[in-house]
Design a protein with these regions (language model features):
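Glycine-rich phosphate-binding loops of nucleotide-dependent enzymes
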Residues: 2-258
Length: 258
C-alpha cells in the first residue's frame, strides 16, 4: 500500500491465559482508504480493534496514530488525537433528537461537556446539520432517535463519529442488523466520506459483499494471525482464505465475486 499512513500497527500481541488473540499483527491504514479485517468468530478482530481504540493494552507491540504513539493510552486521549468509532450495535441517546446527538458530540470536541438531559438548543446546531446533511439525515434532525429505523440510526451514529473530526475511523461490523440494500448504501456513504475528507477507515465485517465491494485492502485474521493481506481479488483467490471459509463462508466469497 502507498500513501499517507494514518495508523501503523506494529507487531501487536495479546494473550488471555493460554489463548493467543493477536500474534505479531502488523498493518497500516492510509488516508482516504478503507481497510477490512475479516475472519471467523474468535479470530481476534475485536481484540485488535480494542487495542487500537485503547480499551485493551497490548502485551507487546506498538500503535501509532498520525505520528503519535497511542499504545496503551485511554480511549478519550486517543479520541482527542483523532480516532472515531462506530459500534456493532449503534450507540445513540434514543431520547434525544437526531440533531442533539450530533450537537453533544460537537460540544465535547470544543470542551463544553453537558449533561445528556439538558437541552442543547442552538449549540453547534449548524455544524450538526451540515454533518446530518452529508449522511442523508438532515430532514430527520428534530426527530427523537427512538423513532428511527435501525438503518437510519446507523447513519446518525456515523454523523456522531464524524463530529469529532477524526483522522481515522474504526467501524465495528457497520452493516450488522441492516437489510442488504441498506448495507450497500451505508458502505458507499462511508467510502465516499473517507475519500472526500481523507479519513482512513478500518472496519470489521461478516458481509462479504460489503467487504469485497468497498474495501481497498483486506486482511484475513485466523487465531490472532494475519494469514493473507492484499487487494480483494488476490485475497479472495488465496487458497488459505478459501480453506478458512469452506462451506457457507466459501459460498459467500464466490457470491461476492459475481
Amino acid at each position: 500500500m502507498s500513501g499517507t499512513s494514518l495508523l501503523s500497527v506494529e507487531r501487536l500481541a495479546k494473550s488471555f491465559g493460554g489463548v493467543v488473540a493477536a500474534r505479531e499483527v502488523t498493518f497500516t491504514v492510509e488516508a482516504g482508504r478503507l481497510i477490512a479485517i475479516i475472519g471467523p468468530n474468535g479470530a481476534g478482530k475485536s481484540t485488535i480493534f480494542n487495542m487500537v481504540g485503547g480499551q485493551l493494552a497490548p502485551d507487546s507491540g506498538r500503535v501509532v496514530l498520525a505520528g503519535h504513539d497511542i499504545t496503551g493510552l485511554p480511549p478519550r486521549r486517543i479520541w482527542r488525537l483523532g480516532l472515531g468509532r462506530t459500534f456493532q450495535v449503534a450507540q445513540t441517546f434514543l431520547s434525544l433528537t437526531v440533531a442533539e446527538n450530533v450537537q453533544m458530540a460537537r460540544s465535547s470536541v470544543h470542551g463544553r461537556t453537558r449533561a445528556w438531559w439538558r437541552p442543547m438548543q442552538g449549540l453547534y446546531r449548524d455544524e450538526a446539520l451540515d454533518l446530518l446533511d452529508r449522511v442523508g439525515m438532515a430532514e430527520n434532525a428534530d426527530r427523537p432517535c427512538s423513532e428511527l429505523a435501525y438503518g437510519d440510526v446507523k447513519r446518525v451514529e456515523l454523523a456522531i463519529a464524524l463530529a469529532g473530526a477524526p483522522k481515522l475511523l474504526l467501524m465495528d461490523e457497520p452493516t450488522a442488523g441492516m437489510a442488504p440494500k441498506e448495507r450497500a448504501q451505508l458502505m458507499a456513504l462511508a467510502a465516499g466520506i473517507a475519500r472526500e475528507r481523507r479519513i482512513g477507515v478500518l472496519f470489521t465485517e461478516h458481509d462479504m459483499d460489503a467487504v469485497f465491494g468497498h474495501a481497498d485492502h483486506v486482511l484475513v485474521l485466523v487465531r490472532g494471525e494475519i494469514i493473507a493481506a492484499g487487494m480483494a481479488e488476490a485475497v479472495r483467490a488465496d487458497p488459505r482464505v478459501r480453506e478458512v471459509y469452506l462451506g457457507g463462508g466459501a459460498h459467500a466469497l464466490r457470491r461476492a465475486a459475481v
